[in-house]
């Protein structure tokens, strides 16, 4: 079973991550299914497209766009699956809807995307910003950046408004496109990665 142009993925667990345990009882924490923060983003690749080449393989764990597994209400108030729905808990997924893939317990970003972790702002004259703007540590790179000797752990600058917030294994990261990385900096030795306390204890990926 293969699609011509799309991956076929299955949610790793459930479509939504919206339940917490309170004194042995399940509490649903979202009030509407439209809130993308509670849509599961973790899937398992069941099939790769026939046309095109990709480093992503069957069996890889992937982080996908929040609309892939999402449900919504149409104009008549009827609950619907997203346009990605295929059948029986399987979903079509475009190549540019996959932001990370995991193989052998290691996360990698596809050619088009990368993830950057912000660093602490140590500027003495600006006290209300906890992280330095437009600069961070490359957390998950790709082969395109490797070709420019920009590898994971590099200190990089990125374009304004290019960052999109994700929580990956208790780390708050910024997803952006490869061409949003604008410069590689030299370390000064005082850089410290910044991760807010709420992210390190959330226990979710979104």
Language model features: what each stretch is:
Residues 1-206:
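Acidic-enriched and Gly/Ser
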